[in-house]
Amino acid sequence: MLQPNRRKFRKEHKGRNEGLATRGTKVSFGEWGLKAIGRGRLTARQIEAARRAMTRHIKRGGRIWIRIFPDKPISKKPAEVRMGNGKGNPEYWVAEIQPGKVLYEMDGVNEALAREAFALAAAKLPIPTTFVTRHLG
């Protein structure tokens, strides 16, 4: 699963996920893309599950690019622990997603197969997405 190798600080503030994506909004590497039209957080497990679904569907053909990376740690306290005593330990990693961000790209397959593969991937993700092409944004 995806996670950073090293970080300057182990824990991070919660922050706010506002605004629209300004970078990574165009299909740059492949011919087809899966773009977020909603906002939210994608965990490393969700990103990997969607990648596996696409890879299995396109079999040996084509190439897939993952355009997002889970670089934000989410901490959690253990079960049945009293309040206080500091922040919990980092439990998993997420990527914060704004509307307009291209999540995955694909090349080397026809459009029908790409649409099917992205539909399988979108079912694994908690945010609404849409199919985009390199030429039609």
Curated annotation (Swiss-Prot):
Residues 1-14 have a biased composition (Basic residues). Residues 1-22 are annotated as: Disordered. GO terms for cellular component: cytosolic large ribosomal subunit. GO terms for biological process: translation. Keywords: Ribonucleoprotein, Ribosomal protein, RNA-binding, rRNA-binding, tRNA-binding. CDD domains: Ribosomal_L16_L10e (cd01433). InterPro entries: Ribosomal_uL16 (IPR047873), Ribosomal_uL16_bact-type (IPR000114), Ribosomal_uL16_CS (IPR020798), Ribosomal_uL16_dom (IPR016180), Ribosomal_uL16_sf (IPR036920). GO terms for molecular function: rRNA binding; structural constituent of ribosome; tRNA binding. Pfam families: Ribosomal_L16. It comes from the Bacteria. Belongs to the universal ribosomal protein uL16 family. Part of the 50S ribosomal subunit. Binds 23S rRNA and is also seen to make contacts with the A and possibly P site tRNAs. This is Large ribosomal subunit protein uL16. It comes from Dechloromonas aromatica (strain RCB). The gene is rplP.
